[in-house]
Each structure stands twice: as structure tokens, then as C-alpha cells.
Amino acid sequence: MEERLKIKDFYITVDRCLVYKDYAIIADTHIGFDVFFGEGGANFPLLQKDEVIKRTLNIIDKYKINNLIINGDIKHNFKPYPKEIKFLKEFIEFLREYINVILIKGNHDTFISSAGYEIFDYFELGNYLIFHGDKEIKIDRDLLKEKFWILGHEHPSIKLRDDVGAILKFPTYLLNKNYIVLPAFNPLSPGNDLINNSASSKIIKKSYLEAEVIAITDIGLLNFGTLRDLREFAKTHL
């Protein structure tokens, strides 16, 4: 099975990232996800930042990139937890020792500017327009129509049941003719099971059922066809 798949002139990968030239694009790192549970009183190990850094370093080495674009929801909490801000700074500053890091704003990304970082509503890269996808962006309408969109926000995933009844869950890419939605990069993010749930993003609400579902599995990338067809199959076979 494929570890990477060429779409247009970029690649999607089993590493939850899109690679274009010397750029890697990820979304939904949600730094501070573990802090949220810890502040709530749960005995939750604060290891998430280190795991996200480990996965990012793997991408840098594996795909020989010089630029990393984080497409929104870089951090998790809406409240300004000091520990989360500390983790966020450690995360960004560590990565900047190796590569150029570009930050795009998501709906969770409060307080990032006040932490001293420049953050964009969108970023143009060749024929691609990169924005988080939680809402429409203020941009020339013709430009919006002519560019292929690279989105995050949705945390797309699917749940399937195997022949012994075990439930398997896979993070996925959603590929439409006009856009691609990236899976959440944070391995702790549960994902939105789009076989059983609706898309949360208004940006893709009218078109996501026609998107191809490309799942990240232990044996590589698997294309399950359109989400609409997969839902119909699931009604009778799963």
C-alpha cells in the first residue's frame, strides 16, 4: 500500500501531512489538549507536546522540508492557561531551530498574537489557498474560486466494524475537486466520524458527501471512494 499519494502536484501522506515542494502542511495540533484535562483534575500525563514534536521532526527528516505550515487550531484551550502558553512557545521555538514555521489562525487560536507570534487568516502557496475552514475568510471572491483550498478544522475520520465486531477508527483526508481537508495532526484528537456524523464546517457542508475518503491505516493510505457511497455501504454491511 502507498505511504504517500500524489494529488495534483502535492502529496498526501500516512503522516497526517500534505507535502508540496519543500513545504509540509499540517492542521489541528491542539497543543494544550492534555493541559485541559489536567486543569480539570484528571490525572493526565503531559506528554502531548513532546509527541507532536516527535511526529513533526519525523516529517522534517522524512520529506526534507524547509517550511512547516500549521493550518489552524495550533493550541487547544479558549482560556489563557499559563502552562499551555508555555508549551506553545516551547513547541514553536523548538521547531524554528530547524525550519521556517508559518501559523494560520483557527477558532481555538486565541492569545497567540499576544504571545508574540504572527498569525495569518490564510496563506497563498502556488495554486493553493490554505485556511483553517471553520468560517469563510475575507478575500477576493474570484481568488477564492480559482484556488484549490487546503483546509483543517473538521478532524475527519471514519469508524468501521470488522468481521468479528471490533470497531476500527481511521483518520482520513477528504478530497473534493475544489479542496482537501486534512486529518488532525494531534494523535489524541478523537476525530469526527463522518459515516455517522455530519460535517461541522460550514465551508464544506454542501459538498462533503461527494468527497473521496482516503484513510490512514497501518498498511498505508486506502481510498474508500466517496463518503456518500461509503455511508450507503455501511448501512447494509457494517
Swiss-Prot record:
Chain ranges passing through the membrane: none
Gene Ontology MF terms in the entry: hydrolase activity
CDD domains xref list: MPP_PF1019
InterPro entries reported in the protein's UniProt record: Calcineurin-like_PHP_ApaH, Metallo-depent_PP-like, Pesterase_MJ0037, Pesterase_MJ0037-like
Name used for this protein in its record: Uncharacterized protein MJ0037
